[in-house]
Amino acid sequence: MGAMAENLLVLCTILAARMALAAADDWIPATATFYGGNDGSGTMGGACGYGNLYDQGYGLENAALSTALFNDGAACGQCYLIVCDTDKAGRWCKPRGAVTVTATNLCPPNWALPSDGGGWCNPPRRHFDMSQPAWERIGVYRAGIVPVLYRRVRCWRRGGVRFTVGGFDHFELVLVANVAGSGSVAAVSVRGAGTGWLQMSRNWGANWQSLAGLAGQPLSFGVTTTGGQYILFQDVAPAGWKFGQTFSTSKQFDY
């Protein structure tokens, strides 16, 4: 991406944030810190199970959510537009700063610290522990923590939805990633060559499980996002698939 395109993208993000601020009721107060180092390498992996965030299409604009936001993994993949609250911490906010992040991890509570003195992710606090590169789009490094305003926004992804089939023997653990629209998944079903549609259950994060023992069968998936859109992904994995393989599709969600 050229410098002009990058500048245009930043400008569009900022304009979207500032225009949206006019509808103040849509914005929710929270706080934000950062982790993972200045290169963001420490944010790879995480409680959503995405692993390498570059490979899965999320990159460094990511965040770990406090328990109140993470919702036992149901928020994995959701996108949030975040701006620094200049009314509360003007000198610690970057001018015209705004960033959109994807939920990729859980920021666990720290019960050894008070919620207003280091236990930023303790319930019922709404808190984003962002990658440092993303956080520095909105806050001055020395601040460490800033008050923010956030709102859910539509996720934009390159390419189609991806399925990684993990597990062993009669246990399939399927990671659903690179989801646009709502970003998060509400339900997944799977069908083999010799079965009807089987409802899968969330195992952890963005991983969905089945105990049907479908090894050796071509796999199709039906996915419903939290926005209510359903897409059928026909014959995603061929009969000879192996555990650990990732399959990309050409279909993508709008909401």
Curated annotation (Swiss-Prot):
The signal sequence is: 1-24
- Give the Pfam families listed for this entry: DPBB_1, Expansin_C
Write down the PANTHER family for this protein, in alphabetical order. EXPANSIN-A15
What biological-process GO terms show up in the record?
plant-type cell wall loosening
* Keywords assigned by UniProt, alphabetized: Cell wall, Cell wall biogenesis/degradation, Membrane, Secreted, Signal
Location of the protein in the cell: Secreted, Cell wall; Membrane
SUPFAM superfamilies membership: Barwin-like endoglucanases, PHL pollen allergen
Q: Where is the Expansin-like CBD domain?
A: 170-249
Major location category of this protein: secreted
What is the recorded name of this protein? Putative expansin-A27
Family under the similarity heading: Belongs to the expansin family. Expansin A subfamily.
Q: Provide the Expansin-like EG45 domain boundaries.
A: 45-160
Locate the coiled-coil region(s) and give their ranges: none
Under the heading SMART domains, the entry gives: DPBB_1
